[in-house]
From Swiss-Prot:
Lineage: Eukaryota, Metazoa, Chordata, Craniata, Vertebrata
Gene3D superfamilies given in the database record: Laminin
Disulfide bond entries: 36-61, 37-68, 50-69, 78-109, 91-110, 112-136, 113-143, 126-144, 182-192, 188-201, 203-216, 222-235, 229-244, 250-262, 268-281, 275-290, 296-308, 314-327, 321-336, 343-356, 362-375, 369-384, 386-399, 405-417, 413-426, 428-441, 447-456, 452-465, 467-481, 487-500, 496-509, 511-525, 531-544, 538-553, 558-579
Keyword terms: Calcium, Disulfide bond, EGF-like domain, Extracellular matrix, Glycoprotein, Repeat, Secreted, Signal
Record-given protein name: Fibulin-1
Organism: Mus musculus (Mouse)
InterPro entries the UniProt entry points to: Anaphylatoxin/fibulin, cEGF, EGF-like_Ca-bd_dom, EGF-like_dom, EGF-type_Asp/Asn_hydroxyl_site, EGF_Ca-bd_CS, Fibulin-1, Fibulin_C
GO MF: calcium ion binding; extracellular matrix structural constituent; fibrinogen binding; fibronectin binding; identical protein binding; integrin binding; peptidase activator activity
Gene expressing this chain: Fbln1
Glycosylation sites: 98, 537, 541
Record region (Disordered): 156-175
């Protein structure tokens, strides 16, 4: 059998196999909803929690499990509320429940049951008032009737109470709650659930069911180890629960809080201190202090013991005495005494007359050392020295300037040294500036002044301009950046697949106005498949075939005595139509005709910009299992449409198959359209046994992409 393979075709058997696999998977996923509901009921009965993860792989089954679990959980909570209504404490014991949702359902049914019993106690009818809900009305009526029967269900029906978990069925009644063997609490001490087959008793949190299946006993969490007391705390069991108590006391001055922590006792606020009336209570951590209320005279202050002690004003007050006087502390006060200093040579009294200060002999306008010297003051005296940058000449007896630049060459300044009277001055070369130390030179960052039109790079003693991508530095000034015309470069013709447009610093590629769009890389043009996107205008009797940059609406009809093959049904928009010979009965001419199949296929080719070797464009594969290799031969031929011998066909053998390869051997400049007629002749003994005809519709685009 042979078939042209022009493009990516999915084999039909694979498609059928995938469909059968999907149908098989769907059949296996059919799960009983009743089994899903049973799983939800079991989760409610066993765990009393519907938030646990559901294990079914079916989404619908998980939804049924969740709904049945919540419905069963509400019935269990309602039965618990009815049972509580029969307890001595009634609905008041609901504070022991932890779940707020559970408490809501239990409380609702407990109250509705209490209303039914109260209605009977007031000699009223057991029909509920219309304002309450339907479910509350059922509980109201059941508890009212139960109270009227005076517990006949538990004691008067002769049922065996040795196994309270299973109770015989009662007569069906119209009211579902009258038919419920758990109404009024049933045989259970705490929680009751009627499954239809049996009555199951259960207990509240903190209790466990006894061996009789009816009674509940407290769980000692302290013995079972199910408590959560911390290290340093002791577990104390309570009815239905437990509490944690510290092992050691908090100590004097502290009390134990409800959360088992130690808190300081404010003895002053609680009034449990023992301070005398003349003292004030001051609270401290773990204790308190008593401070006296005694008032001391002026000049005295209370100490920690409440005694009055003298205040040393000379130490506690800033400058208690006027300038020139000394402070002397006394009992309860202080006195000021005038100072009389005696200054020696080189000292004199300050302006306030309080102390002796040094006489500055070097202070202008006095020049005791003469010109060129430096006067140095000292306590009580002075001395003469040469100024910095000068040295004393013993011959001339004068101070002479030191040329530091000559004496210390290359060691004083980083770049240039210039001598000055008594000192020196450092300077720097171009591109540098003097550092804060006045000697070193540091590089000047010329880029801070933006000398370049785009980017600036500072270098040691200078700077360098450079440009961003798409620009180049001007050869004229070395500062300005000029745009690079990428489209005009020698390689510009290969930058874009269609058209290059230069823009400042870059370029843009464009595609033909129709049939193409720009690829994500911004350079290549991609063909738009109008047949896939649905933007073609083919009629219902035509088939859309995508070609490079456009599309064609074609209609292929099979010749007389031929029918379209089922495997060419164009559901997947394939590019091949195959017609198989189908002769009418007794049509000998049709039977003798060697042509067995007539096929039409469509391919689209670009205009090759560079054509250096033949391009293989289509493959015809044939299998000849009925003919031995030494007797049968397959001859491929191009019979029509080969304009200027632009195409040829060669034969090769691959994987036990004979392959006819159609090649383009000459360049064709589009737009161009031709129909290439190919023949596959099966030759046996020099005679063509049968022939297959393939019509290849070739569309050559005007573009190379």
């Amino acid at each position: 059998m042979e078939r042209p393979v022009p493009s990516r075709l999915v084999p039909l058997p694979l498609l059928l196999l995938s469909s059968l696999s999907l149908l098989a998977a769907r059949a296996n996923a059919d799960i009983s909803m009743e089994a899903c509901c049973t799983d939800g009921n079991q989760m409610a009965n066993q765990h009393r929690d519907c938030s646990l993860p559901y294990t079914s792989e079916s989404k619908e089954c998980r939804m049924v499990q969740e709904q049945c679990c919540h419905n069963q959980l509400e019935e269990l909570h309602c039965a618990t509320g009815i049972n509580l209504a029969s307890e001595p404490e009634g609905c008041a014991s609901l504070h022991s429940y932890n779940s707020s949702l559970e408490t809501i359902f239990i409380k609702r049914c407990c109250h509705c049951c209490m209303l039914g019993k109260a209605s009977l106690a007031r000699d009223q009818t057991c029909e509920p008032i219309v304002m309450i809900s339907y479910q509350c009305g059922l509980v109201f009526r059941a508890c009212c009737v139960k109270a009227r029967e005076n517990s006949d269900f538990v004691q008067g029906n002769g049922a065996d109470l040795q196994d309270p978990a299973k109770i015989p069925d009662e007569e069906d009644q119209e009211d579902p709650y009258l038919n419920d063997r758990c109404r009024g609490g049933g045989p259970c001490k705490q929680q009751c659930r009627d499954t239809g087959d049996e009555v199951i008793c259960s207990c509240f949190v903190g209790y466990q069911l006894q061996s009789d299946g009816v009674s509940c006993e407290d769980i000692n969490e302290c013995i079972t180890g199910s408590h959560n007391c911390r290290l340093g705390e002791s577990c104390i069991n309570t009815v239905g629960s437990f509490r944690c108590q510290r092992d050691s006391s908090c100590g004097t001055g502290y009390e134990l809080t409800e959360d088992n922590n130690c808190k300081d006792i404010d003895e002053c606020e609680t009034g449990i201190h023992n301070c005398p009336p003349d003292f004030i209570c001051q609270n401290t951590l773990g204790s308190f202090r008593c401070r006296p209320k005694l008032q001391c005279k002026s000049g005295f202050i209370q100490d920690a013991l409440g005694n009055c002690i003298d205040i040393n004003e000379c130490l506690s007050i800033s400058a208690p005495c006027p300038v020139g006087q000394t402070c002397i502390n006394t009992e309860g006060s202080y006195t000021c005494q005038k100072n009389v200093p005696n200054c020696g040579r080189g000292y004199h009294l300050n302006e306030e007359g309080t102390r002796c200060v040094d006489v500055d002999e070097c202070s202008p306008p006095a020049e005791p050392c003469g010109k060129g010297h430096h006067c140095l003051n000292s306590p009580g005296s002075f001395r003469c020295e040469c100024k910095a940058g000068f040295y004393f000449d013993g011959i001339s007896r004068t101070c002479v300037d030191i040329n530091e630049c000559q004496r210390y060459p290359g060691r004083l300044c980083g770049h240039k040294c210039e001598n000055t009277p008594g000192s020196f001055h450092c300077s720097c070369s171009a591109g540098f500036r003097l550092s804060v130390d006045g000697r070193s030179c540091e590089d000047v960052n010329e880029c801070l002044n933006s000398p370049c039109s785009q980017e600036c790079a500072n270098v040691y003693g200078s700077y360098q301009c450079y440009c961003r991508r798409g620009y180049q530095l001007s050869d004229v000034d070395g500062v300005t950046c000029e745009d690079i015309d990428e489209c005009a470069l020698p390689t510009g013709g290969h930058i874009c697949s269609y058209r290059c447009i230069n823009i400042p610093g870059s370029f843009q590629c464009s595609c033909p106005s129709s049939g193409y769009r720009l690829a994500p890389n911004g350079r290549n043009c991609q063909d738009i498949d109008e047949c896939v996107t649905g933007i073609h205008n083919c009629s219902i009797n035509e088939t859309c075939f995508n070609i490079q940059g456009s599309f064609r609406c074609l209609s292929f009809e099979c010749p007389e005595n031929y029918r379209r093959s089922a495997d060419t049904f164009r559901q997947e928009k394939t590019d091949t139509v195959r017609c198989i010979k189908s002769c009418r009965p007794n049509d000998e001419a049709c039977v003798r005709d060697p042509v067995h199949t007539v096929s039409h296929t469509v391919i689209s080719l670009p205009t090759f910009r560079e054509f250096t070797r033949p391009e293989e464009i289509i493959f015809l594969r044939a299998v000849t299992p009925l003919y031995p290799a030494n007797q049968a031969d397959i001859i491929f031929d191009i019979t029509e449409g080969n304009l200027r011998d632009s195409f040829d066909i060669i034969k090769r053998y691959e994987d036990g198959m004979t392959v006819g390869v159609v090649r383009q051997v000459r360049p064709i400049v589009g737009p161009f359209y031709a129909v290439l007629k190919l023949e596959m002749n099966y030759v046996l003994g020099g005679v063509v046994s049968h022939r297959n005809v393939v019509n290849v519709h070739i569309f050559v685009s005007e573009y190379w992409f």
